[in-house]
Each structure stands twice: as C-alpha cells, then as structure tokens.
C-alpha cells in the first residue's frame, strides 16, 4: 500500500507537469510569459525525465515536445505515465482484497486513457485532462471509502511522502533557472502544484519567490504545502507507534519528522531570494535557498529509508529514477 500511494502521487504530479508543459508549448497562456515552457522542461530535466538542454531556445522546445509525447504514452519510456500506470494496475490487482470495487476499477482504467503515441497535441491534452480528473476521483474514493486501518495509513504515508518530494522538485526549478540566467515562471509552478487560485486569494499580489515559498513550504493550512505533508506523516506515524507492540518501533521516524517541522517553521522565506526589480533582471537566489531544499530532501529520504528498514525488512534500500540524469537533482 505504501508503494501504491507513492506511485499514484508520482503519476499525478507527472501528468500535471505534462499537461501544463504541452499546453504552454502549443497554445501559450492568455498573458504570454516567455519562460513558462523553459521552466517546466527544466523541472522535467531535474527529475530525470529529460536531458539537460537550453530549453529557452524555441527549436529545442519544439524538439522536446515530441519527447513529452513519449513520456506520456510510450510503453518503451521508463518511468513515464505508461510505466507508472502499468505498475499501479499490477499493485491494485495484488491488493484487490483491500480496495473497494470502484477504487480498484479506477486504478485499472488509468492505462487505457493514455493516447496513441502519434496523437496530436490537442488529443494529448484532452487525455491528460481526463487522466487528472480520474486521479482526483480516485483520491476522493480513497479518502471517503477506505477504513482508517493500517492499509489506509501506509497508502496515505506513501502519498504524503511522495508529494513532499515532488514539491521540493518543483521548487528546485527556481534555483536551477536562476543559475541558468532566467527567471522561473512562478505562475506556472503554482498552476502545476494546483495552488494558483489559493495564491491569488491569499496574497492578492503578483507571485514572488518568497511568497510562493511561504505558500508551498510553510503554510500548514495549504494541502499542497510541504509542511502539511510532513504534519500528516507525523499524525499517521504517531498512530502506528501507539498501536505497535514493539516499543520504540517508529521513534526514529518521529524524530526525523520533528526535525523537518522545526526546520520549516524556523525558515524566514523573505531572506531566501531577492525579487528582480525589472523584467530583464534575474531573481537573486541566496545559497540558503538550495541548502534548505537539499536539506529537506535528504531528511525526507532518510525518513523513507528508516521506514523501509522498520516495516519492509525484505526490501533493500534502493533508489530508482527515470533514465535521464539518473533521476538526480543537479
């Protein structure tokens, strides 16, 4: 159930990234922002789905659009949507007795929603929209239909852990883009993280790096914020610890989560970046920005490894990722 949750969340984030990237590359937003596509493709490179290139160049963006289709639909592309949906179906079949009929059926119906490899961009966008709607429906069924036993808790732990990792991957794009001489599209990051309207209501201002960090890292009332995921992880691990017959079984995990929470709450987002004053300037990202994200990422990975050793002793401590760049953040 833990890995079912992780792969479900991983596939949802990839589908959202692909949807916004294809939309921006083919139609463009209502208010054009030149760095939208470059930002999204850079994040896909950071997460290992694409090679590192100059994604500001229009010809490279056009070439990469074909690569995005492969990530979405090709059965030969490792760690693309086809691969993830195939794994979800296999896991759902193995866990059939722990899932409701409707939940199991939604898991099995994700794979047929993928478009043909030679589909045009409009068909691809329509299919990605349908996939994300089904994933949202699946999340709703899991939330409303599953009893709060250990199966649900491990599924929830897997999802919250993976969402936390994906949030850090998105935010790493800000630092990466600044290092490469252009500003990351903050509107695009908010849209990909499903927080665009939340930001508008909360701040009623043009997106800035400090405020985006405040919303996506420090806001414990935002279900898409990192600290929200960590608090949910702690809540579920605390229940498992109380119900465990082995004293101290989850004590290490709780210590790691407490350290992450303290680190986030002690963060002063206003000192992590200096907003550009003109459109031609690049945002100045302080070294503490990457130090914070890398430190949080290492702590989440430490939590994952510790939980694996505590509960899945048959599993080796392995880290798999997409083919390009070995899935490493650079």
Short names for language-model regions:
Residues 1-330:
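Alpha-helical transmembrane segments and their helix-helix packing motifs
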